[in-house]
A protein has these predicted regions:
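Core catalytic region of metal-dependent phosphoesterases/phosphodiesterases
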Residues: 20, 43-148
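Catalytic-adjacent loop/helix segments of enzymes that bind and process anionic phosphate/sulfate esters
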Residues: 150-181
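N-terminal membrane-anchoring alpha-helices
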Residues: 1-23
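Beta-strand-turn-beta hairpins that frame and shape the catalytic cleft
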Residues: 17-30, 137-138, 145-157, 179
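Short, flexible loop segments at the rims of nucleotide/cofactor-binding pockets, characterized by
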Residues: 8, 35-40, 65-69, 116-118, ...
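Short gly/ser/thr-rich secondary-structure transition/capping motifs
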Residues: 12-15, 42, 137-140, 166-169
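Structural motif
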Residues: 29-31, 61-63, 89, 157-159
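Short extracytoplasmic
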Residues: 22-49
Length: 181
């Protein structure tokens, strides 16, 4: 548990190569996920500014859980500001809709019904998605979309909303997807 307190303040960039079956143009995707921003997390905004300035990537993928509470909206705007001039796409996580609820860690070790699910979002997810969409990013929450990436070409994408809160709906690939026999 002690290391967890330290490690959460030491963000890192990890690199993975994903093999593909057919020759396709090389594309580098920067994934931003699980920021859980709230006042006091400014170090994450600074880390992301450094990433934007020093890393080479073609497209940004935001995969949700950006808010650590209702008071994190300004930090979310600041965190994404250096990336919004790049091509991007996004899906949402539960902590884009609902603020986190403290949980007993022991609950993960036993069968538990857990807290009652909430149905009314209390986080400013619409403002965040509007910011990203206004920058030309593609919303893939239960949708498909095409994204033109300079130097790479068009990416045909498919996404779902958060499965943990039962908002996911799988959609058929867009006609732009090549289908093989």
């Amino acid at each position: 548990l002690a290391w967890g307190r330290v490690e959460r303040r030491l963000p890192v960039v990890r690199r993975f190569e994903v093999p593909v079956a057919r020759p396709v143009p090389e594309v580098t995707i920067l994934q931003i996920s699980d920021l859980h921003l709230f006042p006091g997390q400014e170090f994450l905004v600074e880390f992301l500014r450094r990433v934007a300035a020093t890393e080479r990537f073609d497209v940004v993928a935001s995969t949700g859980d950006n808010f650590g509470g209702p008071d994190g909206a300004e930090l979310v705007r600041e965190a994404y500001a250096p990336f919004l001039d790049r091509p991007g796409f996004f899906v949402l996580g539960s902590n884009d809709y609902y603020s986190p609820v403290r949980k007993n860690w022991g609950r993960y070790l036993t069968r538990s019904k857990g807290p009652r699910p909430r149905v009314v979002p209390d986080l400013p997810w619409t403002a965040m998605t509007r910011m990203m969409a206004d920058a030309g990013w593609v919303d893939l929450s239960n949708r498909t979309g095409d994204l033109e990436v300079p130097g790479v070409g068009a990416l045909s994408l498919l996404g779902t909303d958060d499965a943990h809160i039962h908002r996911d709906r799988y959609v058929d690939p867009a006609p732009s997807w090549e289908r093989e026999g």
